[in-house]
Each structure stands twice: as C-alpha cells, then as structure tokens.
C-alpha cells in the first residue's frame, strides 16, 4: 500500500484482519526505511503498529481523543492521519515534528514530549466532555515506563475516585527508554503471568469447600488465605483497587484479541484500563534485541547491518566527560553516589553502574523523587551526583527550591543537555535552567568552556561543601582539547580572560565561547579591539572582575545559549544598576521569549540570530566608530 496516499484513518473501517496485517508490514517497512535516513524513535513505534491501527479502526479520531504519553510513539498515528509524505522532513527545521503537534493535525489533540502527562490531560478532557454533555471517547495511551511517574499515579487515583468514563491503554513493553525499575514494574510483571492465578484460585476454592464448618477460626483463616492469594496473584488487582475495570493482559500484536478487548472496553462504564503487551522494536531485529535502550531513539543507520551512521568523533561527549570524572573521583571517595531518573545510557553512567552498582541509583521516570532523595542522602554526609537533563529538571523545581536550596544541602546537579538540543524541539530544549536557578539562594551555577575545564569543574563541585552546586553541559561532543591528568579546584565565582581588548568586551560561557572568539578575531582584523571573558561561573558572578570592567566604561555584550529573561545577561545588567554604573552600555544576546522549535542546532542558532556574524554586527553598532566592518 502507498502510505503517502493516506488522507485520514477512515479507510481502516472496511479492512479485514488479513488486510490489516499487510498494512502492518507496510508501515514497519516504511518506518525502517524512512528513519534509516532521518533518525528518530524507531523502536517505540515499531512496537505499537497493530495497537495504533486497532485504535483508529474502532474509534473515530478526531472526535474520539487519542493522547499519546511522551509522544515519541506517535509516528504510526501520524501515518494514518495523512502525514506519511512528510516523513522525509522528520525532526528537521520546519519539518514534521517527532511528537504530536496540535498545529500539524486535528488528530493531534494533545502535545507531549515529557512523560506521565497524558492521564491528567485526559481527565481534563473527559470532565469537559461531561460538563458539555457531549459523547466521545477519551483514550490516553501510556507506557509502563511513564506509568512510574508520580503525576501519572496521581491521575490514576483521581480518575478512579471520580469513576470518570475513560479508556486508558497501558502499552507494556517492559521498557521505557532503558529497562524499567521499581515496584510497579514488578506488579506489571506479575500481571503478565497472571493466568496462573485462575488455576490456583479454582484449586483453592475446591479445597475450601472441603473444610468442615467447625468454627469461626477455621473459616476466617481460610478467607484470609484466599484474600492473600488474590492480592499476590489476581490479574489487575492494583488497578481494580484504584477504581478501574482492568482488561488484559492482551497481545498487542494480535488483531482479534485487540478488537475483542477494545470493543468490551467501549461498552464498559467508568474508567477502564486495557493492559496491552507489545514488543519494542518489533519487526526489525537490531531494535528487537536491544535491552539497554540504544534503539529507543537513533540517528541514521544502515538497515542491513544495523550500524549507526555517525560522523567520526574527534572529541568525547560532554556527558561522558562529566560522568567519567565523577567515576574517577568515586574510586577514592565512597561517599559519592550517582542518581539518574531513567537516563543511565543518555547520561553515560553505564561505567559507573558497572563498577559501583550499589552506588548508582536509577529511580525511573521520577525526577521529583530523585531530587529529594539526593537531598536526603546529602543530610547523611553522602555526596550525591544528580545527573538530569535540563528539560527534565523543570519537573523537579519545587524539590530544588524547597528541599535542596532552602536547606543548603551539598547536592551536585549535573544539568545535561543544557542549551539547544535540536531535533527533539520545543519540549526538550535546555534553555530555561539558568532563569529558574539563578535567583535561588545558595545555588552555584557553572558551565565550562571546554571538556578540560569541565573535568576541573566536576572536581570543584565535589570539593564544594557550602551548599548546592550545578554544572551545565551541552548535548554532543566537546572540542577535542588536551585533558590534564591532575584535577584541580577552580575558585568559586572566578572568571578568566580569553582575549584582551580595549574597545568592547564580550562576556559568555560554554558553547558560545567559540562564537565569541571567532567574532573577536574578525573584529581585531577590522581594527576593533574586543576583550573576551569566560564567565564560567554564572552564579556567583566574578564581582571584582565586573567592577573593573564596568569601571572602564566600555560597551559590554553578553551572549548565552539560554533564555534572555532572567538569564546571565540580566544578572550583569542588575549588577551594573545596583552598583551605580548607570552609564554602562550592556546589551544581551540569547534565546528570545518564545519556545524554540525542532531543527539542527546550527539552523536554530541562525534563526534566532545567535551567530558569529550577528555578534560582529552587534559590536559594530555598540561602538561609535567608523571602523571598516569585518
């Protein structure tokens, strides 16, 4: 079937099961071929082909509402709703988004990117439906990994209490990104083998009937045994106790079983949970055999071999530099522990986990818990390293404020994927953390200019004992600089001069330093002398350096790959104002007041005007001179 000719899912209504099976093969082949060129979330989508087709066949989107938790598994949904022809642009600038996008299609009723939000949103839609007295199904689709998130459990509790009509699809592939952890994962594991319960229950009931009625104690004991067995083995008791009708487990690749179960769910009043067992990566052997999450989301790859197409790496990944330095320090300091909310692979903590399994803690998709747990460990003299993506640190903001900063606890937060991350787009850009951390009392924020300085700042963080400290580091690789053998502590709040200059100054840090250096060199050739400062401590700032610089009364330009509002540049302006430098000319470059879409980082920087050319032009406008332009 030519999938690019699909306009909407209505064609599914008249298809037989054998035709649907053929469609499944076509979709898997299409996804494997298309994503080999663009990259994307291949394994999650190969696992939900039959489930997505079944949902679109039995329900009427967009009248009936599908909410895809996290959203990375929505590619099949996009194909069935008329977007197959756009897959060549997947996750590229102004191309097809890798997550549901309301402006893309009326079938995308809820936008996602972070996990565990679908049930709360579905509850809101269902309550609105009931208040408006309309009739449509609300169907959130959530994975077993996302179900470990506290927000999802809060929603389950509320939905069950209110007895709201809703069909929750639990897509259980036994993995989120990496293998799942936690007690709830173990509960689901028991449910997968719950068929054993029915045989044991029947045998127990037969035995109980043989017990003579000789006294209350025997009868009571027998009932307790029966109840205990129920809570150990009964299929779906966890969800039933929350107020849901539990259906399953059902084979998520068997159309007949899916249809039978979903039709029953449609007729059932109140909240229903359909437990669907799927195989992540189904239909592509390299993805099917992946047990650590390598094929969850990928770049381009070779279909036949399953090898990834990657440019030759000349420098280590930022995540690896940080995690390996933490590991090096952990070998001589037993107080150091590493904590991750379900991202051990992305945060490059596999080596730490292998060497110190008891000191490496993966809490699952539970950022709030991870953050406060780190705080608790700090109260007992441990040195917790919390490795968390910038975009996911947002989910634990109150815990950072209330539990870490307020108590001034020695927690080292590794803020991975800081700055623009590119193809994952609006939901994943790491551009807000400076703005929401800079104003917190006791917090120290750093970002290195290169990987060598990065390892020294990790050492600095582990030596720091005066409260919380955060290290920002970007997605991707470093610069390939020489790495010192011996680690050293860098004085807190100290900046360094990278290039001397007398006519203007650029204050910046991290990934924008090469841009600033190139701009300054071009300006030098044009006769404009510009100082470049590595403001590696975003907070506290180097106040002595700032006093000296502002006293020279030269134009200052701040550059940051982060939000302008509340950012580093704002801090410099505040310092100048509060210290009486009222004639100071300070201008800022950074991320404007909007969400930044998906695309390559280079393209996005061009689009927002954060380039070497733009820096050169800005400096020229700031200096009252007729110097020849660079």
Swiss-Prot record:
Disulphide-bridged cysteine pairs: none
Entry-linked Gene3D superfamilies: 3.40.50.920, 3.40.50.970
Pfam families listed in its UniProt record: DXP_synthase_N, Transket_pyr, Transketolase_C
Molecular-function GO terms, alphabetical: 1-deoxy-D-xylulose-5-phosphate synthase activity; magnesium ion binding; thiamine pyrophosphate binding
Needed cofactors: Mg(2+); thiamine diphosphate
Record-linked PROSITE patterns: TRANSKETOLASE_1 (PS00801), TRANSKETOLASE_2 (PS00802)
Keywords: Isoprene biosynthesis, Magnesium, Metal-binding, Thiamine biosynthesis, Thiamine pyrophosphate, Transferase
Pathway: Metabolic intermediate biosynthesis; 1-deoxy-D-xylulose 5-phosphate biosynthesis; 1-deoxy-D-xylulose 5-phosphate from D-glyceraldehyde 3-phosphate and pyruvate: step 1/1
Gene Ontology CC, one term: cytosol
Name listed for the protein in its UniProt record: 1-deoxy-D-xylulose-5-phosphate synthase
């Amino acid at each position: 079937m030519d999938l690019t000719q699909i306009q909407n899912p209505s064609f599914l209504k008249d298809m037989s099961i054998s035709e649907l099976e053929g469609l499944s093969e076509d979709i898997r082949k299409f996804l494997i071929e298309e994503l080999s060129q663009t990259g994307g979330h291949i394994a999650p989508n190969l696992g939900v082909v039959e489930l997505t087709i079944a949902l679109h066949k039995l329900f009427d989107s967009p009248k009936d509402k599908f909410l895809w938790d996290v959203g990375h598994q929505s590619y099949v949904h996009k194909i069935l709703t008329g977007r197959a022809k756009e897959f060549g642009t997947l996750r590229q600038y102004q191309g097809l988004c890798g997550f549901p996008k309301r402006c893309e299609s009326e079938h995308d009723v809820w936008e996602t990117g972070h996990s565990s939000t679908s049930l709360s949103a579905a509850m809101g839609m269902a309550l609105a439906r009931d208040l408006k007295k309309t009739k449509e199904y609300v169907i959130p689709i959530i994975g077993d990994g996302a179900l470990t998130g506290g927000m999802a459990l809060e929603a389950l509790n509320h939905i069950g209490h209110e007895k709201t009509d809703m069909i929750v699809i639990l897509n259980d592939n036994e993995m989120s990104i990496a293998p799942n952890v936690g007690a709830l994962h173990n509960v689901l594991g028991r449910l997968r083998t719950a068929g054993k319960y029915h045989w044991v229950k029947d045998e127990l009931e037969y035995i109980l009937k043989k017990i003579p009625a000789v006294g209350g104690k025997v009868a009571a004991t027998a009932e307790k045994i029966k109840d205990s067995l129920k809570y150990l083995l009964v299929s779906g008791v966890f969800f039933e106790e929350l107020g849901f009708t539990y259906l399953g487990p059902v084979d998520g690749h068997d159309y007949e079983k899916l249809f039978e179960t979903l039709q029953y769910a449609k007729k059932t009043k109140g909240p229903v949970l359909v437990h669907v067992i799927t195989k992540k990566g189904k239909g592509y052997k390299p993805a099917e055999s992946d047990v650590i999450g390598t094929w969850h989301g990928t770049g381009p790859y070779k279909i036949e071999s399953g090898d990834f197409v990657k440019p030759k790496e000349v420098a280590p990944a930022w995540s690896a530099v940080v995690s390996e330095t933490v590991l090096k320090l952990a070998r001589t300091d037993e107080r150091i522990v590493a904590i991750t909310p379900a991202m051990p692979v992305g945060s490059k903590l596999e080596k730490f986990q292998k060497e110190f399994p008891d000191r490496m803690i993966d809490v699952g998709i539970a950022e709030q818990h991870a953050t406060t747990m780190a705080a608790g460990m700090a109260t007992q003299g441990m040195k917790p390293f919390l490795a968390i993506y910038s975009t996911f640190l947002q989910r634990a903001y109150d815990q950072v404020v209330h539990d870490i900063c307020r108590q001034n606890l020695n927690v080292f937060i590794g803020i991975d994927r800081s700055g623009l991350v590119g193809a994952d787009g609006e939901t994943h850009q790491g551009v807000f953390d400076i703005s929401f951390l800079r104003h917190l009392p006791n917090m120290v924020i750093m970002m290195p200019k290169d990987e060598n300085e990065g390892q020294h700042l990790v050492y600095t963080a582990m030596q720091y004992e005066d409260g919380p400290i955060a290290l920002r580091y970007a997605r991707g690789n470093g610069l390939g600089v020489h790495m010192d053998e011996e680690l050293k502590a860098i004085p807190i709040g100290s900046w360094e001069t990278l290039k001397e200059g007398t006519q203007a100054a650029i204050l910046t840090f991290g990934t924008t330093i090469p841009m600033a250096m190139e701009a300054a060199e071009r300006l030098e050739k044009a006769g404009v002398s510009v100082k470049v400062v590595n403001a590696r401590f975003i907070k506290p700032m180097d106040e002595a350096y700032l006093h000296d610089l502002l006293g020279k009364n030269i134009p200052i330009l701040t550059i940051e790959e982060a939000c302008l509002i509340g950012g580093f540049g704002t801090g410099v302006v505040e310092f100048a104002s509060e210290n009486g430098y009222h004639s100071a000319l300070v201008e800022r470059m950074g991320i404007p007041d909007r969400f930044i879409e998906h695309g390559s980082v280079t393209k996005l920087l061009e689009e927002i005007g954060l380039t070497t050319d733009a820096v050169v032009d800005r400096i020229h406008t700031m200096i009252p001179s007729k110097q020849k332009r660079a």
